[in-house]
Amino acid sequence: MSDEMTTERGPGLVSSLGDVARRRFESKSVTTPVQGVGLEARGIHAWFGDRMVLEDMSLDFWSGTVTALIGPSGCGKSTFIRTLNRMHEFIPGAAMAGQVLLNGEDIYSSGTDVTKIRLKIGMVFQKPNPFPSMTISENVLAGLKLAQLKVDNKDDLLEECLERAGLWNEVKDRLSSYGGSLSGGQQQRLCIARSLAVRPEVLLMDEPCSALDPGSTLRIEETISHLAASMTIIIVTHNMQQAARVSDYTAFLLSDGGPGKMVEFGPTGEIFSRPKDIRTENYVTGRFG
Amino acid sequence: MTTAAMVKPSKPWQASPRQRFNSALVYIAAIVASYVIVAITPMKGKLAYAFVFFVAFIVFDFTLNLFSRGFPVAKDAIARAIVAAGICVAVFPILSIIATVIIRGYHGLHIGLFTHDMALNSVTDPVNQGGLLHALTGTAILVLVALILSVPLGILTAIYMTEIRGRFMKPIKFLVQAMSGVPSIVAGLFILSAVVYPITKGYSGFVGSLALSILMIPTVARTSEEVLLLIPNDLREAGVALGGTHWRTVAMVVVPAARSGLVTAMILGVARIAGETAPILLLTGGGDKVNGDPFHGPMGSLPFYIWKSYSVGTPESITRAWAAILVLLAIVLVLFVSARLLSERRSSK
């Protein structure tokens, strides 16, 4: 594609993504006030072996908002999101520096019960991963069993979680069939329902729609919008339309061959319509990346 | 009528009648050549026919393909012929063993085999007297005790190697692989010197099971390890991300997801030991009576019964031995087929 063509297309795309983000912002600001800082990342660095993959990320995630992390592959988005609920340490050779504060307390301070942290900060993965040995209802309630939590009424919780994940109507008649029998999009919403059952304050989503078709993607985006009222959501996405549609704030990460760094952070409307950094503008207009 | 209904399905990639005629000609030429060459040379016997047929087939097939389709196709034909010959060499002995066992064993089959033991009969009695019951129950008890001992140990070893991946993972992996090559007589002698002489001082089914466990644990551990490695890492991460501890995630997510594969591992372990003879000869003492107590007294088993009957050497006892071999083979076959069915059900899910 020639340079002229991209330049011509560029501003059009910027303004249309900006419009999408603004429409969302206007519809939302009336209904949900921002509730204070839920999760704060302070100077996060991450390494795999000797290689630094993430440098000095500091970000505040406000309660009741959706924050999107965008950037090209390999810029450290997924690594960053995994440091937020201590899943980073699962990879052999991983190391990190910095603090992650949940309600003001560092989740990495010694003596912290890491399983409690992961209960408060849930995660939805890139590939739908329902537990194959469990039925739909067992999948939703798996977190309770895994973390040995007690609830008074499991049926109510089951319905509530599936309802919030936008799956209840599709599966209410076959709760005892296996999770693997659902379609990919339904499986992913089942995984969202499963994360909701332990009542997390923060939900991390690592490219939750990258393996799904547009219809399922739309359903999940609706789910995200519903959930955002009551929790902090952080979503990694490669799809800039999606970032514009669902998020309140957007962070743009970039790696120039070395560790990934945050280039720009701001309200989603600003990032897509008036980016301050030329690299952000190039990325959101599709001129590179 | 739509056009789709008028179009006939065809398979243009299949061999044309002419090509099929040519390859039939190659077979016939090779057969004729093998007869002629064996007749005019001093070579003798079935093996000579097979060998000459194989060489002649390769030569004719190569020539035909070289002239009709060129050198690369001809090379391909040689490779195909060698692979086919390899399969025949590998499969023929197995089929031959099965056929021999069936032909020689079915004379000795009668319903009494499963209802009588040999307490009141000797192996030289007529074939329709006495039975295998003591050997069947003995083998069942030996295998069951070995199963109880080695399945938990084997699966836990596999979990250590795949889930915990501790500091000793490498040496343990090496040991398990080395152990699966241990000759069974060594396991028997080990139990004999470590348990029977110093402690029990006598035959029993239990010490036999101990020796069988030594042979079974590596099989169960290796197969379970392979099965657990197939479980996608996503599931482990999902379990931990839901607030489960490492152990609870393994117990509630990973192991249930691998359930049918672990059952397969168990069955393969049983098939490995069901026919083991050497440690049984050393440790269980045989016996002609049904013995339900694994801790006291000699205990019969199928391999022991086969060995004993065959070593007597009378026509009746040899028929008994072949019948017992047939029963043992059938049991192992059933185990393998059920293992295969279970693992197929897993992969189709």
Task: Give residue spans per PLM region.
Chain B
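Transmembrane-helix boundary motif in ABC transporter permease subunits
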Residues: 64-72, 146-176, 189, 340-345
